[in-house]
Design a protein with these regions (language model features):
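Active-site histidine-anchored catalytic micro-motif
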Residues: 2-108
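Conformational coupling and interaction surfaces
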Residues: 75-76, 80-188
């Protein structure tokens, strides 16, 4: 969906509907919502149904390192949505850029482990090889030489592996127009 026009107007989407539907189900199991891009769907769901805040935990791949912040792809796609979510009481496990960039993989490993996995594996690997030859790829922060950063993978990893990771609980900042973090004292 397009970015929120402001911090009070939701953008209708199938993703927002799904989040609301799942969060409002009567179920004793915890609900984790993994967000591998902008927070538009989650913010829209919250603006439409604020009761979801106490019924899920969001795991978001996005934002720059603390305490300063700065430009980052997922955050930059919808700053208003980040401020809606950070201004809510919703639990958020944020995985910022300095953490998700720690998931590099070599082209050789992708060729060994992904390419042999049938038509889909071959397609994914071939697409990556073709993209790696473009000028955009050579300028990408997600590629360094013969390796790529698989930045979205920490989200499922947080759920699949035992919780033996190091983390910090910090007050949610307000995100400014230049994507830096500001402590305003109003967020949780």
């Amino acid at each position: 969906p397009p970015a929120l026009p402001d911090a009070a107007t939701p953008v209708p989407s199938e993703g927002a509907k799904l989040i609301i539907r799942e969060a409002m189900k009567e179920d004793t199991r915890p609900l984790f919502v993994l967000l591998l891009g902008p927070l538009t769907d989650l913010a829209s769901a919250y603006l439409q149904e604020p009761r979801i805040a106490g019924r899920l935990t969001a795991i978001w791949i996005g934002g720059a390192p603390y305490p300063v912040g700065g430009p980052e792809f997922n955050l930059g796609n919808d700053v208003n949505a980040v401020n809606v979510v950070f201004g809510s009481t919703m639990p958020v496990w944020q995985v910022p850029k300095n953490v998700y960039e720690m998931m590099p993989v070599s082209m050789a490993e992708l060729e060994y482990r992904v390419r042999p996995q049938g038509a889909v594996g071959r397609y994914l690997f071939d697409q990556l090889v073709a993209y790696s030859q473009t000028p955009e790829s050579r300028a990408s922060a997600f590629r360094t030489g013969e390796s790529w950063v698989l930045g979205d993978n920490p989200a499922p990893g947080l759920l699949l592996y035992e919780h033996r990771f190091q983390f910090d609980w910090v007050p949610a900042p307000y995100v400014t127009a230049d994507q830096t973090y500001a402590a305003i004292g109003r967020n949780r």
